[in-house]
Amino acid sequence: MPVPKRRMSRSNTRSRRAQWKAALPTLVRCNNPACRQPKLPHVVCPNCGTYDRRPVLSS
């Protein structure tokens, strides 16, 4: 198996790790015309409890 020939310096390690960034979650508007709150896609709306305009959770 290949192994590194030299130890990677601290500055090279940190500059390589600087490219790793956390991505913001994608938000969409709820399909319920009465709600329209931002929510995660493909997830039941936590505000009104609907999914694809169908009531799923009873509030």
From Swiss-Prot:
Region Disordered, residue ranges: 1-20
GO molecular function, one term: structural constituent of ribosome
Keyword set, alphabetical order: Ribonucleoprotein, Ribosomal protein
GO biological process assignments: translation
The keyword DNA-binding appears for this protein: no
GO cellular component: large ribosomal subunit
Position of the signal peptide: none
Biased composition (Basic residues): 1-19
Pfam families in alphabetical order: Ribosomal_L32p
PANTHER family named among the record's database cross-references: 50S RIBOSOMAL PROTEIN L32 (PTHR35534), LARGE RIBOSOMAL SUBUNIT PROTEIN BL32 (PTHR35534:SF1)
Recorded family membership: Belongs to the bacterial ribosomal protein bL32 family.
Annotated protein name in UniProt: Large ribosomal subunit protein bL32
Source organism per UniProt: Acidothermus cellulolyticus (strain ATCC 43068 / DSM 8971 / 11B)
